[in-house]
C-alpha cells in the first residue's frame, strides 16, 4: 500500500492532464510507488536466504548448531534477544537469532576454498543476486530500482582494502549496505 493515496478517477476525463500535473507536483508524492521506487534493508527476513546460501555452500546443515549468549561476540557485538542456546537452523529462524547467521556468513565468505575474502564475498553476493536482490525484477512498473548488493570493490574502496568478515557482519542479518525493494522482498 502506498500513502498518500489518490482517486484514480482524477486521471480520466477532461481534466486528467491538469489532475496528473497536480498529483505529480504534490509534495506528499502520491504517485511515488514505494514498492519499487525505494529500497530498504531486508532485516531478519534475509536470514532464510542466509541459511539457504550456507547450505548450498556446504558450510551449514539443518542440524548444525551455534551458540548464542545474547549476540555475536566481537567488539561491541551484534546483539540478540533472549532464547535458548545452542540453536540449529530451524530454531535460529524461529527465534530470529542474529548470532547464528553471523557464524554462517563468516563461514561462507572466509571459507578456505576461496583464495581470499574478496572471492568468498563475491560468491556470497552472487547467491544473493540469484534471489532477485540487486537487480530489477522486470516488472512493467516505471521507476523500478535495483536495490543494492554491495561488492567487494565497494568495501575495498570504503575501507582502503582493509576489511574482513567482521567489518561487514551486519550483512549477515540483512542490514548494512544490503537493500531491496518491498517487491523484491515479496518475490523472495
Positions of predicted regions on the chain:
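Beta-lactam-recognizing serine transpeptidase/beta-lactamase-like catalytic domain environment
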Residues: 1-44, 49-187
Amino acid at each position: 500500500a502506498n500513502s498518500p493515496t489518490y482517486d484514480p478517477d482524477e486521471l480520466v476525463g477532461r481534466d486528467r492532464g491538469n489532475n496528473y500535473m497536480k498529483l505529480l507536483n504534490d509534495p506528499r508524492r502520491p504517485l511515488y510507488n514505494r514498492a519499487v521506487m525505494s529500497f530498504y534493508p531486508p532485516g531478519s527476513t534475509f536470514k532464510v536466504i542466509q541459511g539457504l546460501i550456507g547450505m548450498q555452500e556446504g558450510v551449514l546443515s539443518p542440524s548444525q548448531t551455534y551458540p548464542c549468549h545474547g549476540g555475536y561476540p566481537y567488539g561491541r557485538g551484534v546483539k540478540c534477544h533472549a532464547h535458548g542456546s545452542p540453536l540449529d537452523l530451524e530454531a535460529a529462524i524461529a527465534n530470529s537469532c542474529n548470532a547464528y547467521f553471523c557464524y554462517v556468513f563468516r563461514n561462507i565468505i572466509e571459507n578456505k576454498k576461496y583464495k581470499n575474502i574478496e572471492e568468498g564475498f563475491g560468491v556470497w553476493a552472487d547467491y544473493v543476486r540469484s534471489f532477485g536482490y540487486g537487480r530489477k525484477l522486470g516488472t512493467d512498473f516505471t521507476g523500478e530500482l535495483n536495490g543494492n548488493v554491495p561488492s567487494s570493490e565497494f568495501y575495498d574502496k570504503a575501507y582502503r582494502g582493509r576489511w574482513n568478515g567482521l567489518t561487514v557482519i551486519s550483512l549477515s542479518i540483512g542490514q548494512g549496505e544490503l537493500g531491496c525493494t518491498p517487491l523484491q522482498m515479496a518475490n523472495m
